[in-house]
């Protein structure tokens, strides 16, 4: 069975780390260039000052660039997510939304640089 963007969004929303952090994948685009993810700040996902817990926000953002790139490059390539960085601009309250975009041109650039097995 081929994974579709809709199936992956549902599966990722039900995945235990996301589910219990109030994280819902709203959608993956049909061409795997975009994803939208939401986190509902509630009693389980907030910190002592009633804003979004940083660990939950990190979980909300961690796998999506990797997944978009992996689906664009295909099975002939191995994609590893080796580090992440978050700048907390302001306290998160209510529903937090993250948008992820990996343009086709960027995926093609990575494919060309990795041609022949080179690390990118």
Where are these regions (language model features)?
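Short structured motifs
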Residues: 20-25, 82-88, 108-109
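Alpha-helical membrane-targeting segments
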Residues: 1-20, 44, 48
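Catalytic strand-loop segment that frames the active site of acyl-thioester-processing enzymes
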Residues: 20-51
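Hydrophobic beta-strand-centered segment that forms part of the acyl-chain substrate-binding groove
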Residues: 68-105
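HotDog/MaoC-like acyl-thioester-processing domains
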Residues: 93, 103-120
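Short connector loops at helix/strand junctions that flank enzyme active sites
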Residues: 18-20, 32, 52, 60, ...
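Hot-dog-fold acyl-thioester-processing enzymes
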Residues: 44-64, 77
């Amino acid at each position: 069975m081929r994974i579709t963007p809709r199936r992956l969004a549902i599966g990722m929303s039900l995945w235990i780390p996301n589910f219990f952090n109030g994280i819902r994948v709203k959608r993956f685009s049909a061409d795997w260039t975009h994803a939208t993810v939401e986190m509902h700040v509630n009693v389980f996902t907030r910190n002592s000052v009633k804003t979004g817990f940083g660990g939950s926000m990190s979980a909300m953002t961690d796998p999506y660039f990797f997944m978009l790139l992996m689906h664009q490059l295909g099975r002939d390539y191995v994609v590893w997510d080796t580090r992440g960085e978050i700048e907390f601009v302001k306290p998160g309250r209510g529903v937090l939304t993250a948008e992820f975009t990996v343009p086709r041109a960027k995926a093609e650039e990575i494919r060309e640089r990795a041609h022949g097995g080179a690390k990118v």
